[in-house]
Amino acid sequence: MESDKMEIYESLIRWLGVLQLSAPHENIQQLSDGVALAQALNLIAPEMFSEGWLAKIKVDVGHNWRLKVSNLKKIIEGVYVYYQDILSLNLSEKLRPDAMKIAEKCDGYELGRLLQLILGCAVNCLEKQKYITQIMELEESLQRNIMAALQDIEYVWQGVSPSRNSINATSLDVKTLQEDRDSLAQKCHETNKKMLILIEEKSVLQQEITKLQALIARYENPNLIGDDGTSLGPVQLGSTRYNDLRKVVDSLKDELLQAETARDDLKMKSAMQEKEIADLQVKIDELHTATAEIAQLKDEIDILKEANDKLKMCETQLLTYKKKLEDYNDLKKQIKMLEECSAEYLKQNLQHEEEAKKYSGLKGQVELYKKEIQDLHAKLDSEMSKTVKTEFEYNQLQAKLSAVQREKENLLSERDVLRETCDELKCGQAAEDSESGNTMSKELHSSDVRDRIERLERENKVLREGQGGQTALSQLLDDANQRNEKLRDQLKAANQRVLLLSQHHNEDISSKSDMDIQLKQALELNEQRSSQIDEAQSQMTQLHTKIANLEAALAAKDQELLAADSRYKKCVEKAKEVIKTLDPRAINEALLLEKPSQDGEASSSSATGSGGDASTLTSTGSGRVPMGVQEEQLIATAFYRLGMTCQREAVDSRLALLSGPGQSFLSRQRQPAPRKPMNMPFAKK
């Protein structure tokens, strides 16, 4: 099945080549942009798909699938509107081709469905004969495929017939009335036969009565001649002739009484039959009226059928217009929402521009802060290098100071020892001086002691000389300590300053990062809103185009409604003229009916004038003045009278044909009696 359908769709693509389009249309990829299809629709139905509509189709599409989708959607919507408004056919939404698949994937199945709908437009347009002849001139295989596509479209168009319970009920009533009429016509035929038989019997009895009257006159005449040629003479009492005549008279009186009784019986029968005939005539008249009413009902049924079809068409059109109105209202709401959003976006853009201006001023400050931070970083690096150098010098000085302190402690300990020895020696010398002289002391002291004393003296000299260096070292140490304290103070101040600068730097970095984040967010919001504004503007342009299309469609519908109103007025005037020609007594009724209709039109016009915006909308939507009830009755009566006259003429012509000379006796006997009342000749007596 799918291969057959694809073959049909390929033949439809080949059929497009017959139309001689300017756009490329040789394969599915070339047809997916919708330009060739739009040109084909403009060529097929220029009254619907005008040059203005064709100008809305974008030509240079390329590989932009969004523009392809918009073109295809416009084409599909135009085809559906053409089927609904021009061809009066409602297509289901299941048959709507998918524009996305055609534009994105170049789907041949969906494109074939769209081509099938365009073929339906070509076959049902004003110049359909031209396109049908073009199709007939193609190859047989192409003709078969195109005919299969048309059969599929016709199968889609076929609708289910509506339920007609009321029509079935009326048809059943008509059948029963026809059966009653046939039975009554049969009874009338039988009574007519009986009447003919009685009329023949009556004529026979009248002939016999005339014969008897002639015999009586003959016997009463005195100059009568008998059978043997002799004159019978006058009749006298007691004669045989008188007796014979008397017998004959008595017998004739008896026969006369019998004939009179038979005549009275026949009169009674004929009166009964006349009553039956009158009843049957009344029934026949009733049946004729019933048949006329049935004909009227049939006509009404036909009118109601047409009205029902028109009503369905109007309902479908009304539903489409309602949908279009709802879409129009939704579009209005969307336009209002978009206008509000655009106003909000403009306000936000202005705010963002102001913020951007502020941020541009802040950018200069941030750059200044950056430069200051860079300078502070350079200063901090130099200070750090200085602090490292001072720390290194401080460590060296501490090492030297510790070595000097150790030497000082050693020297102090040795000084103490030497002092003790000096004191001991002084004490020893004083004692030696007191006891003996220097020779004794020299003799008493050993060489070791002398050596030790000499060594101590030398060391004392050295210590005295070293004590002068120690004072210099102590001064140097004090100076180094002062410098160290100064450096410590400077280092503390530098550390504090470094901490403050680092804190300021961190704060500046955090503020800068916050500002950068805010700037990034503001720029992203600005880009998003600019993109949203662009999308809203594109949607606004699309909505403006849709509104323009809808307004053009509404203007066309208004023109159609005005044309329908003019046609309706012409029909009303024709109906009035027909009524005047049929029944001149209805002129006054028509004049009386015109006045309330004019009053109703004036009141409806005043009501529509005072109805405000909603009434103007409804008047533009409908545009039709409502028909008055009396005008409808007037048109209905005129139509029924015309139908009755036409029916009577048809029945009379049929009876004239049936009563022709070339009919048999039985066929003439089966014919119904004429509708005029019968005047019986024997009813006078």
Curated annotation (Swiss-Prot):
GO biological-process terms attached to the record: cytoplasmic microtubule organization; cytoskeleton-dependent intracellular transport; endocytosis
Boundaries of every Calponin-homology (CH) domain copy: 6-122
InterPro entries xrefs: CH_dom, CH_dom_sf, Hook_C, HOOK_N, Troponin_sf
Feature: compositional bias, Polar residues: 661-670
Xref: Pfam families: HOOK (PF05622), HOOK_N (PF19047)
Comp. bias (Low complexity): 602-623
Protein name: Protein hook
Organism for this UniProt entry: Aedes aegypti (Yellowfever mosquito)
Gene: hook
